[in-house]
Amino acid sequence: MSLEARFKHTTRSSRWMVMFARLMSAGLFGAVAFGLSPRLELESRILLGFDVAMLTYIGSLVWRMAAADAVSTRDESGKIEFSNWIVLLLAGFLSGLSLLAVGLMLHRSRSWSPLMTNFHLGLSLAAVFLTWGLVHIVFGIHYARMYYDPTPPAGEPADRPPLEFPDDLMPDFWDFMYFAFTLAICYQVSDISIRGRQLRRVVLAHVLLSFLNVTLILGFVVEIVGTFISPTN
């Protein structure tokens, strides 16, 4: 095995190990939250565990990004992130999972007291917005990996990064979070230029997924609020 192939194999293995550790930690905290709420209904316990797991996973990512400067971002981005297709599948899965989790709540909402209604409303909205945030954090990390990838896609110059930032400083994770969340909210970024063909395709998928996600979220939020605060409750 060549040195380059061995390096790629090691990097790929470390990605799976890091992701497995994060998922296990998030799942453990979610399971603890589920287990410590035996008096709640099953749907409520599932959604509470889901929220805690999502918050734990996001916290682990933010904690790592907060301690990373530009050099650390370059070195670490390839160790915690995967290919385009895995990112898209993960983002779509997370979006659907949050909506499914909220759907568990809707068919039982009219049997709750006002206090429990407010509690479940908070759980439902937290699930939606935590998942929305995680989807775009995942895309931001993916943009960092594509930017610092030492082997660019075929046909693209190796000496020109796929993103052009307005200053001459090396971008860190927060620069890529800015890019990802601005795309998610505004569908465009005025001060960062996209110069890579492969990255344009990822951005297109990101924007389309974001639009679909926001459309579904708005529909679910209206349904949740309308169901939970209905005068017939």
Language-model-derived ranges and their functions:
Residues 15-37:
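The first (N-terminal) embedded transmembrane alpha-helix
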